[in-house]
Amino acid sequence: MEIVIRTGSGDVRGSKENGIAVFRGIPYAEPPVGAHRFTAPRPPRPWDGVRDATEFSATAPRPPYPEAIGALLIERFIPGDDYLTLNVWTPDPNAVGLPVMVWIHGGAFTNGSGSEPVYDGAAFARDGVVFVSFNYRLGIIGFADLPDAPSNRGLLDQIAALEWVRDNIARFGGDPGNVTVFGESAGAMSVCTLMATPRARGLFRRAILQSGAGNMAVAAEDATTIAAVIAHRLGVEPTAAALAHVPVAQLLDVQQQVAQEIQGAPDPAVWGERIAGGSVLLPFAPVIDGELLSQRPAEAIAGGAGHDVDLLFGTTTDEYRLFLAPTGLLPFITGDYVTTHLAKSGLDADAAKAYTAEGRGEEPGDILASIITDQVFRIPALRIAESRVDAPARTFGYEFAWRTPQLDGILGACHAVELPFVFRTLDRAASLVGTNPPEELAETVHNAWVRFATSGDPGWPAWNPETRSVMRFDHPVSEMVTDPYPATRALWDGVPL
């Protein structure tokens, strides 16, 4: 059954699927091609007639994941240039005032799309939510800092998508005044950034941070260095005008080289002392440009930004195992390597013993995975919560602790494992969660997200600095836990991240 809805740019034709109206590939901006590859997003040109919106649009240009991780996180690749589009699932386009949830995908700001199978919005629509997902520019195209182009183009795309939601979602049954924006990993970092920037103020009422916070931002001088190296390797000037003519495949090749070098052991002769010293973890990420961002998002939120936004935040128990276990690196990590990493991170060598004492690792590889889980994910998220103690809006915390049996159980409750539970798409994620994951847990997690989007209350007490209580999601029992892993949490007090 076909359904036609009039948007601000023209009519779109969706389809009825199991009682839910679904619209795919609706443009929220013009395709970023040719001279417009690096410009700010431009409103879509109005069209005559009815535009077909029954199939997903192209996905943003991106490289494949490394093989070991790509076997677990299945991506959908759809070729084409018209990828600044969004998708809508609605229970009833004729309804009035339904809650809206807008999903921002993760992928280190270099991978992912709004059309991945695990992000199907049908379960949210079945539960009375108008669900929206979208694509945004990634990698060099979205985040390389160039003097003749706006910075943070990927973020500008996200804001444009939210503005489309504000202007159009009522036509799909949604309430533009009750929007929850949520994301995972780089998507959660994006949400935190949107909370921090005045440009996005008023576009959403609630936010969910899944495994990402506000500490990932690239300093302007580092962004300039990265752009210069990219251009040098491509044999062009470090400008948008020059890079606009470079074939996408070449951009992606250099993008992968740059990411591997910066995340490995960057040569100071190439990258300078700052980047060689670890100033950049994600080379393609929000840039502190003095316009969209004047400081790191975490600092802006500590100063009061986003304090009127209800917040649900959390992490998985074993985040970083996704990046160490599938590659086979865990058994080869030595105690000396852990000690060196602790020293670089500002912690004493004895910190490793605290991780073992709290049951977070016996072998060096397991200890390192827990340390980096805290360093990159858990502690930054807790610092966001701590900075909102006096906020008028409420803050709620969770920990996702269910351990996947995949790879003989060595992944644990790794990064991204909660996604098919949130979306109730367990059948789309067997590579990550196995063939018999607990559907009851998916129902519990998903329903909490729906409750939060509907009312601002996920169903458990708000986070506070006295008890630090969070909901620990696991099977067969999900329960409130007071101050998880307090000793290793305290190790990071006062340590810059």
UniProtKB/Swiss-Prot annotation:
Keywords of this entry: Hydrolase, Secreted, Serine esterase
EC number(s) on file: 3.1.1.1
Enzyme class: hydrolase
Reaction equations catalysed: a carboxylic ester + H2O = an alcohol + a carboxylate + H(+)
Coiled-coil spans in chain: none
Keyword Cytoplasm: no
GO cellular component assignments: extracellular region
Gene Ontology molecular function: carboxylesterase activity
Residues the record marks as active site: 185, 319, 415
Subcellular location as annotated: Secreted
Protein family according to the UniProt entry: Belongs to the type-B carboxylesterase/lipase family.
Protein name as catalogued: Carboxylesterase
Organism: Thermobifida fusca (strain YX)
